[in-house]
Amino acid sequence: MMLTVEKMQVNNYFSDNAPIIGWRDQDVEAVKLVQPWKPEALEHDQWPPDYKAVYAWRIKQLAILRSNPELLRSAKLYYSTRPDEFIMHWMDTYNPRKKTGKWMPFVFFERQDEMVKFLKDLVDNGNSGLVEKCRDAGATWCSCAYSVWSLIFIADDAIGWGSRKQDLVDKLGNPDSIFEKMRLILKRMPDVFLPQYEATFMRIINRENGSVIMGEAGDNIGRGGRTSMYFKDESAHYERPEKIEAALGDNTNTQIDISSVNGLGNVFHRRREAGVEWQPGKEIEKGFTQVFVIDWRDHPEKTQEWYDTRKAKYEREGMLHVFAQEVDRN
């Protein structure tokens, strides 16, 4: 039997979460008649998620949490050790290529869920990691979402972000930049989980628990103070990576390189070759960089037909070397 979401709850959700009002009227109406679905990581044959069903679940849950402060406190305690669930339950992600519904609940496919668990394992064990990724797999979005979770739930935490150019770290209004991603995630989060925070250029501060996310660019990476973890975005493409390594060495316990490949012999490649590939549930080996690979085959929407069509296009245009780097990780 089809469950419905109370009209009052729907109206409250859209009034309390103003950015979602941008939905078309027919989308809002459709949510009222949807079977709520509690989001979880999906396998290939389960993809894509029913995003309206996720919003329907959120609406019902928010109505319960707002009416029961003790239950809300319990929910916050539960989520404080489960970043993957908090992200899927309450964060949104963005795809500008879609004609409509560009914002959607951040429901993971399996490899994304494993990546968030990988990040938490690194922090819990004080190890460094490396993410070798193909393009368009959501690795940066997953890392931004994890950073926001940590900002909210880990008191007095300090997370660093760096990339080779300042505009890649933060550019107001550009969701391709790292800090704009995180500002947008916070902007779209329900008020019951949202702390009092301040978001300025390359810095986000949680005023309630003292946690901070800070950004740096180019040769300045690693020179802004100590952090619990530091994300180096597209680190295979840095101009002077050894200089950055020297700065970061004593400033963080957990350094995370996230990048597509960029040839042989650079710091990213050497670290990748010397590392140990991480596996879910396997004890992390101390002293080795933990390696996490996201391949195009991990993405449910990247089929063999997609691969063949994309490769043929690059071949016609004389760009197979770019395809090999960005898709094949070669």
What are these regions (language model features)?
Residues 2-330:
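Phosphate/NTP-binding elements of NTP-utilizing enzymes
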